Structure formats: C-alpha cells, structure tokens
C-alpha cells in the first residue's frame, strides 16, 4: 500500500513565439506581440512492480530471467515521466529476511540487481519504495536497493528520515515526488502533520 504525491514545479512553463504586426499608418514603430503556449506534461503511473525473486528460490524468477515488462515497454516510455511502486528489494544476496506471524502467507521479495535494467529500459524515472516489502531484507536490503537504483539513474522516495521525497529536472522541467505508506521504515501515510512538512519542503524547493 502506498500513496503518491507529485508536484510539477514548471508545469506552467511557457514557450513564446513572436508575431510581427504591420506598423499603423500613423506610426513608424513596430510592435511585437508574445503568444504564450502551455506545455503539456504527461505522467504514467504504475502500481506494484515485482519482476521476480531469487528468494527463497530461483524458481520464482521468470523463465530465462526474461523481461516481463517487454510487451508494455513502448507504452511505459511514451510519457514525459514514468513512475512505479517497487514492490520489493533490488539486490542479489544477503540481508536478513523478515519473519512473519504466519509463515504460510509470508511473502519476501529479492529481485536480482540485473533486473533493474528492465526498469531503466522501460523508461522509469522515479520509484516509490514506500510499501510493505521495502524492508523484506532489513537495512541491508534497503541500502542495496538504493545503490542499484542510483546506478541506473532512477530516482526514488518514501523512506522515513533519509529519502522522504525527491526533486529532479528532466527536459527543462522540475519535478518533485513524495511517497507514503503505513509500514515501518516508510514515510507514514498516517502522520498528517509530518506529511504536510514533506509537502511544504517540496514546494519550497
């Protein structure tokens, strides 16, 4: 479960075109009129993304480590910004798997780092890591996931105290994202006052 907040700091950016007018009969000066056009920004938002897990077994990976996003890649890339919720961790080995009260319904996801390329190839610009699986392998899993996303140039938000929001520029437009969830280690969706501060800080920048 997660919630997304996005700001387009420059969504009202104007592009100007100059149109020349003929001088009036009684004037010898030219006047220039500016015609302003609004720039339309398109954003594609994707829900839970889990490309496969090598934990507890490689049998949970797709056949031949195939890219399950391939068939929708062109659609995902057909936007100014593509956002998704990374449901799990992104690293190869290690970490401490979480324990569950009921092991029969315990889901723990560790997607191999090489699968991160599928996210980049599909045009993902920013990911929410605020969800119930970002802590599946504890602090090590979170840190390794961040490092792998950094190496791919994919931004992220949603971790309490460290990466609560993110601001970045693309094609001359400045974007701000925040992500919230009701889970440990994430920016709490239930702490309204803190959420207001996160939003306030985004708007101030």
Where are these predicted regions, by residue range?
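C-terminal motif of bacterial Sec signal peptides marking the signal peptidase cleavage site
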Residues: 8-10
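Acidic, metal/ion-coordinating pockets
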Residues: 12-205
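Sec-dependent N-terminal signal peptides
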Residues: 1-6
């Amino acid at each position: 479960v997660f919630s997304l907040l996005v700001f387009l700091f420059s969504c009202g950016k104007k592009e100007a075109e100059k149109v020349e007018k003929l001088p009036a009969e009684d004037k010898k000066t030219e006047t220039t009129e500016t015609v302003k056009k609004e720039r339309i920004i398109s954003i594609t938002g994707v829900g839970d993304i889990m490309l496969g897990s090598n934990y507890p077994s490689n049998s949970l990976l797709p056949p031949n480590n195939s890219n399950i996003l391939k068939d929708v890649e062109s659609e995902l890339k057909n936007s100014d910004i593509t956002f998704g919720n990374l449901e799990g961790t992104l690293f190869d080995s290690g970490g401490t798997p979480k324990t569950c009260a009921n092991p029969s319904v315990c889901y723990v996801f560790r997607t191999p780092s090489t699968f991160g390329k599928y996210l980049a190839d599909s045009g993902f610009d920013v990911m929410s890591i605020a969800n119930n699986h970002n802590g599946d392998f504890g602090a090590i899993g979170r840190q390794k996931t961040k490092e792998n996303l950094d190496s791919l140039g994919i931004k992220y938000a949603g971790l309490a105290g460290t990466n609560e929001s993110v601001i970045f520029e693309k094609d001359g437009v400045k974007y701000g994202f925040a992500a919230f969830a009701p889970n440990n280690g994430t920016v709490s969706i239930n702490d309204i006052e803190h959420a207001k501060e996160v939003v306030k800080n985004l708007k101030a920048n």
